[in-house]
Amino acid sequence: MATSISTQRGQVFIGELPQDFLRISPTQQQQQIQLDAQAAQQLQYSGVMATMGRLSITVVQAKLAKNYGMTRMDPYCRIRLGYAVYETPTAHNGAKNPRWNKVIQCTIPPGVDSFYIEIFDERAFSMDDRIAWTHITIPETLKEGKHVDEWFSLSGKQGDDKEGMINLVMSYTSVPAMMPAQPVVLMPTVYQQGVGYVPIADPIYNPGMPMAAPPPAVNPQHETREEDIQSIKDMFPTMDPEVIRSVLEAQGGNRDAAVNSLLQMVEDS
Protein backbone atom coordinates (compact mmCIF):
# COMPACT_ATOMS: atom_id res chain seq x y z
CA MET A 1 0.00 0.00 0.00
CA ALA A 2 1.32 3.44 -0.92
CA THR A 3 2.26 5.86 1.90
CA SER A 4 2.38 9.65 1.85
CA ILE A 5 5.41 11.75 2.84
CA SER A 6 5.35 15.55 3.01
CA THR A 7 8.21 17.52 1.44
CA GLN A 8 8.91 21.16 0.71
CA ARG A 9 7.30 20.75 -2.72
CA GLY A 10 4.25 18.86 -1.51
CA GLN A 11 3.19 15.32 -0.80
CA VAL A 12 4.98 12.38 -2.37
CA PHE A 13 3.41 8.94 -2.52
CA ILE A 14 5.78 6.03 -1.94
CA GLY A 15 4.82 2.44 -2.72
CA GLU A 16 6.10 -0.77 -4.21
CA LEU A 17 7.48 -0.35 -7.71
CA PRO A 18 6.57 -2.83 -10.46
CA GLN A 19 9.18 -5.47 -11.28
CA ASP A 20 9.71 -4.05 -14.78
CA PHE A 21 10.29 -0.49 -13.50
CA LEU A 22 13.06 1.24 -15.52
CA ARG A 23 13.71 -1.94 -17.48
CA ILE A 24 14.12 -1.78 -21.23
CA SER A 25 12.08 -4.44 -22.98
CA PRO A 26 14.03 -6.33 -25.67
CA THR A 27 13.14 -5.49 -29.24
CA GLN A 28 11.44 -7.97 -31.54
CA GLN A 29 14.72 -8.52 -33.39
CA GLN A 30 16.61 -9.22 -30.14
CA GLN A 31 13.91 -11.66 -29.05
CA GLN A 32 14.09 -13.38 -32.44
CA ILE A 33 17.89 -13.75 -32.20
CA GLN A 34 17.50 -15.31 -28.75
CA LEU A 35 14.80 -17.69 -30.00
CA ASP A 36 16.91 -18.71 -33.01
CA ALA A 37 19.91 -19.35 -30.76
CA GLN A 38 17.83 -21.40 -28.33
CA ALA A 39 16.33 -23.39 -31.21
CA ALA A 40 19.74 -24.12 -32.69
CA GLN A 41 21.13 -25.03 -29.27
CA GLN A 42 18.26 -27.41 -28.57
CA LEU A 43 18.77 -29.02 -31.96
CA GLN A 44 22.52 -29.31 -31.34
CA TYR A 45 22.18 -30.91 -27.91
CA SER A 46 19.26 -33.18 -28.75
CA GLY A 47 21.57 -36.20 -28.91
CA VAL A 48 20.31 -39.02 -31.13
CA MET A 49 17.67 -37.79 -33.55
CA ALA A 50 16.30 -40.36 -36.00
CA THR A 51 15.06 -38.24 -38.88
CA MET A 52 12.14 -39.26 -41.06
CA GLY A 53 13.43 -37.65 -44.21
CA ARG A 54 14.32 -34.44 -45.99
CA LEU A 55 11.71 -31.98 -47.26
CA SER A 56 12.55 -29.68 -50.15
CA ILE A 57 10.46 -26.48 -50.19
CA THR A 58 10.71 -24.10 -53.14
CA VAL A 59 9.21 -20.73 -52.20
CA VAL A 60 8.24 -19.52 -55.66
CA GLN A 61 6.14 -16.37 -55.33
CA ALA A 62 3.20 -14.74 -53.55
CA LYS A 63 0.16 -12.68 -54.50
CA LEU A 64 -0.56 -10.37 -51.58
CA ALA A 65 -3.79 -8.49 -50.98
CA LYS A 66 -2.31 -5.11 -50.01
CA ASN A 67 0.90 -3.09 -50.12
CA TYR A 68 1.47 -1.81 -46.59
CA GLY A 69 3.45 1.40 -46.19
CA MET A 70 4.14 4.49 -48.28
CA THR A 71 6.59 2.77 -50.65
CA ARG A 72 6.76 -0.61 -52.37
CA MET A 73 7.27 -3.43 -49.90
CA ASP A 74 10.44 -5.56 -49.75
CA PRO A 75 9.01 -8.94 -48.68
CA TYR A 76 10.89 -12.03 -47.49
CA CYS A 77 9.68 -15.37 -46.06
CA ARG A 78 10.53 -17.14 -42.83
CA ILE A 79 9.80 -20.86 -42.36
CA ARG A 80 9.73 -22.66 -39.01
CA LEU A 81 9.87 -26.46 -39.10
CA GLY A 82 10.45 -28.16 -35.77
CA TYR A 83 13.27 -26.24 -34.07
CA ALA A 84 14.78 -25.00 -37.33
CA VAL A 85 14.26 -21.55 -38.86
CA TYR A 86 14.88 -20.75 -42.55
CA GLU A 87 14.61 -17.50 -44.51
CA THR A 88 14.47 -16.51 -48.17
CA PRO A 89 16.32 -13.54 -49.65
CA THR A 90 14.45 -10.24 -49.76
CA ALA A 91 12.44 -9.52 -52.90
CA HIS A 92 13.30 -5.82 -53.20
CA ASN A 93 10.39 -3.75 -54.53
CA GLY A 94 8.37 -6.95 -54.74
CA ALA A 95 5.33 -5.13 -53.32
CA LYS A 96 2.20 -7.30 -53.72
CA ASN A 97 3.81 -9.72 -56.20
CA PRO A 98 7.16 -10.83 -54.74
CA ARG A 99 9.16 -13.61 -56.39
CA TRP A 100 11.83 -15.59 -54.55
CA ASN A 101 12.37 -18.98 -56.26
CA LYS A 102 14.33 -20.03 -53.17
CA VAL A 103 14.92 -23.75 -52.53
CA ILE A 104 15.05 -24.65 -48.82
CA GLN A 105 16.17 -28.11 -47.66
CA CYS A 106 14.56 -29.06 -44.34
CA THR A 107 15.22 -32.11 -42.15
CA ILE A 108 11.96 -33.45 -40.72
CA PRO A 109 12.28 -34.67 -37.10
CA PRO A 110 9.97 -37.42 -35.76
CA GLY A 111 6.47 -36.27 -34.86
CA VAL A 112 6.56 -33.13 -37.04
CA ASP A 113 3.96 -33.07 -39.82
CA SER A 114 3.59 -29.34 -40.55
CA PHE A 115 5.46 -26.05 -40.77
CA TYR A 116 4.71 -22.36 -40.25
CA ILE A 117 5.49 -19.73 -42.87
CA GLU A 118 5.50 -15.95 -42.40
CA ILE A 119 6.02 -13.05 -44.81
CA PHE A 120 7.75 -9.90 -43.53
CA ASP A 121 8.25 -6.48 -45.09
CA GLU A 122 11.92 -5.57 -44.61
CA ARG A 123 12.29 -2.05 -43.17
CA ALA A 124 15.44 0.07 -43.25
CA PHE A 125 14.80 2.32 -40.22
CA SER A 126 12.33 0.29 -38.12
CA MET A 127 11.46 -3.26 -37.19
CA ASP A 128 10.40 -5.55 -40.03
CA ASP A 129 6.62 -5.73 -40.33
CA ARG A 130 4.90 -9.13 -40.39
CA ILE A 131 2.25 -8.89 -43.09
CA ALA A 132 1.05 -12.47 -43.71
CA TRP A 133 1.31 -15.99 -42.33
CA THR A 134 -0.12 -19.50 -42.62
CA HIS A 135 0.24 -22.98 -41.12
CA ILE A 136 0.79 -25.74 -43.70
CA THR A 137 0.38 -29.48 -43.14
CA ILE A 138 2.95 -31.55 -45.04
CA PRO A 139 0.98 -33.53 -47.68
CA GLU A 140 1.07 -37.32 -47.25
CA THR A 141 1.34 -37.74 -51.03
CA LEU A 142 4.95 -36.52 -50.83
CA LYS A 143 6.00 -39.82 -49.23
CA GLU A 144 4.70 -41.62 -52.33
CA GLY A 145 7.35 -39.89 -54.43
CA LYS A 146 5.02 -37.21 -55.82
CA HIS A 147 5.73 -33.48 -56.10
CA VAL A 148 3.27 -30.90 -54.79
CA ASP A 149 2.88 -27.54 -56.57
CA GLU A 150 0.09 -25.59 -54.86
CA TRP A 151 -1.09 -22.15 -53.80
CA PHE A 152 -1.82 -21.71 -50.09
CA SER A 153 -4.04 -19.02 -48.56
CA LEU A 154 -2.45 -16.43 -46.26
CA SER A 155 -3.89 -14.78 -43.16
CA GLY A 156 -3.06 -11.29 -41.93
CA LYS A 157 -4.53 -7.91 -41.07
CA GLN A 158 -7.24 -8.39 -43.68
CA GLY A 159 -8.46 -11.53 -41.87
CA ASP A 160 -8.06 -15.29 -42.00
CA ASP A 161 -7.24 -16.54 -45.52
CA LYS A 162 -7.75 -12.99 -46.86
CA GLU A 163 -4.17 -11.69 -47.14
CA GLY A 164 -3.40 -13.35 -50.47
CA MET A 165 -1.75 -16.62 -51.51
CA ILE A 166 1.73 -18.13 -51.71
CA ASN A 167 3.02 -20.67 -54.24
CA LEU A 168 5.12 -23.55 -52.86
CA VAL A 169 6.66 -26.56 -54.60
CA MET A 170 7.48 -29.45 -52.27
CA SER A 171 9.19 -32.82 -52.60
CA TYR A 172 10.28 -35.47 -50.10
CA THR A 173 13.38 -37.65 -49.89
CA SER A 174 13.83 -40.55 -47.47
CA VAL A 175 17.12 -40.69 -45.57
CA PRO A 176 18.54 -43.49 -43.37
CA ALA A 177 18.35 -43.16 -39.60
CA MET A 178 21.27 -41.40 -37.97
CA MET A 179 23.86 -43.35 -35.99
CA PRO A 180 24.08 -42.75 -32.20
CA ALA A 181 25.61 -39.40 -31.49
CA GLN A 182 29.24 -39.20 -30.40
CA PRO A 183 30.24 -37.18 -27.33
CA VAL A 184 29.83 -33.50 -28.06
CA VAL A 185 32.78 -31.18 -27.55
CA LEU A 186 31.52 -28.03 -25.83
CA MET A 187 33.36 -24.74 -26.08
CA PRO A 188 32.57 -22.76 -22.91
CA THR A 189 34.30 -19.58 -24.04
CA VAL A 190 35.09 -18.01 -27.40
CA TYR A 191 37.80 -15.31 -27.59
CA GLN A 192 37.25 -13.21 -30.69
CA GLN A 193 40.89 -12.17 -31.16
CA GLY A 194 40.39 -12.92 -34.82
CA VAL A 195 37.50 -14.14 -36.88
CA GLY A 196 37.13 -17.89 -36.44
CA TYR A 197 39.68 -18.23 -33.58
CA VAL A 198 38.43 -20.70 -30.98
CA PRO A 199 40.50 -21.88 -27.99
CA ILE A 200 41.06 -25.60 -27.49
CA ALA A 201 38.90 -27.02 -24.71
CA ASP A 202 38.72 -30.41 -23.02
CA PRO A 203 35.82 -32.55 -24.27
CA ILE A 204 32.75 -32.73 -22.05
CA TYR A 205 30.84 -36.01 -22.32
CA ASN A 206 27.09 -36.40 -22.02
CA PRO A 207 25.96 -38.23 -18.83
CA GLY A 208 25.43 -41.95 -19.26
CA MET A 209 27.56 -42.24 -22.39
CA PRO A 210 30.70 -44.43 -22.43
CA MET A 211 34.02 -42.70 -22.48
CA ALA A 212 35.55 -42.84 -25.92
CA ALA A 213 39.15 -42.53 -26.99
CA PRO A 214 40.16 -39.01 -28.06
CA PRO A 215 39.62 -38.52 -31.79
CA PRO A 216 42.71 -38.20 -33.99
CA ALA A 217 44.04 -34.73 -34.70
CA VAL A 218 42.18 -33.04 -37.53
CA ASN A 219 44.15 -31.79 -40.46
CA PRO A 220 43.88 -27.97 -40.41
CA GLN A 221 43.77 -28.00 -44.20
CA HIS A 222 40.44 -29.88 -44.17
CA GLU A 223 38.36 -28.87 -47.15
CA THR A 224 35.25 -26.95 -46.18
CA ARG A 225 32.14 -28.23 -47.94
CA GLU A 226 29.67 -25.70 -49.30
CA GLU A 227 26.71 -27.81 -48.19
CA ASP A 228 27.96 -27.62 -44.59
CA ILE A 229 28.20 -23.83 -44.85
CA GLN A 230 24.68 -23.61 -46.29
CA SER A 231 23.31 -25.97 -43.64
CA ILE A 232 24.77 -23.82 -40.85
CA LYS A 233 23.63 -20.65 -42.65
CA ASP A 234 20.05 -21.98 -42.53
CA MET A 235 20.38 -22.27 -38.74
CA PHE A 236 21.92 -18.76 -38.42
CA PRO A 237 20.23 -16.73 -41.20
CA THR A 238 21.65 -13.42 -39.93
CA MET A 239 25.25 -14.64 -39.74
CA ASP A 240 27.79 -13.56 -42.39
CA PRO A 241 28.70 -16.61 -44.57
CA GLU A 242 32.40 -15.69 -44.37
CA VAL A 243 32.26 -15.83 -40.57
CA ILE A 244 30.64 -19.27 -40.80
CA ARG A 245 33.34 -20.40 -43.24
CA SER A 246 36.14 -19.13 -40.95
CA VAL A 247 34.71 -20.85 -37.86
CA LEU A 248 34.16 -24.08 -39.81
CA GLU A 249 37.75 -24.02 -41.07
CA ALA A 250 39.03 -23.31 -37.55
CA GLN A 251 37.17 -26.44 -36.40
CA GLY A 252 38.76 -28.55 -39.14
CA GLY A 253 35.44 -28.98 -40.95
CA ASN A 254 33.67 -30.32 -37.83
CA ARG A 255 30.11 -29.06 -38.30
CA ASP A 256 28.93 -29.77 -34.72
CA ALA A 257 31.88 -27.96 -33.17
CA ALA A 258 31.35 -25.02 -35.53
CA VAL A 259 27.68 -24.76 -34.48
CA ASN A 260 28.78 -24.75 -30.82
CA SER A 261 31.21 -21.92 -31.48
CA LEU A 262 28.63 -19.85 -33.36
CA LEU A 263 26.12 -20.33 -30.54
CA GLN A 264 28.67 -18.94 -28.09
CA MET A 265 29.33 -16.00 -30.41
CA VAL A 266 25.59 -15.22 -30.54
CA GLU A 267 25.22 -15.47 -26.75
CA ASP A 268 28.29 -13.29 -26.08
CA SER A 269 27.31 -10.63 -28.63
Curated annotation (Swiss-Prot):
SMART domains attached to this UniProt entry: C2, CUE
PROSITE patterns for the chain: C2 (PS50004), CUE (PS51140)
Keyword Cell wall biogenesis/degradation: no
Ranges spanned by the short sequence motif AIM2, renumbered to the chain: 151-154
Motif AIM1 mapped to chain: 133-136
GO biological process, one term: ubiquitin-dependent protein catabolic process
UniProt domain CUE: residue ranges: 224-267
InterPro entries referenced in this protein's UniProt entry, alphabetically: C2_dom, C2_domain_sf, CUE, TOLIP_CUE, Tollip_C2, UBA-like_sf
Domain notes for this protein: Both ATG8-interaction motifs (AIM1 and AIM2) are required for the association with ATG8 family proteins.
Record text on subunit structure and interactions: Interacts with ATG8 family proteins (via AIM motifs), and ubiquitin (via CUE domain). of cytotoxic polyQ proteins aggregates.
Name of the protein this chain belongs to: Toll-interacting protein B
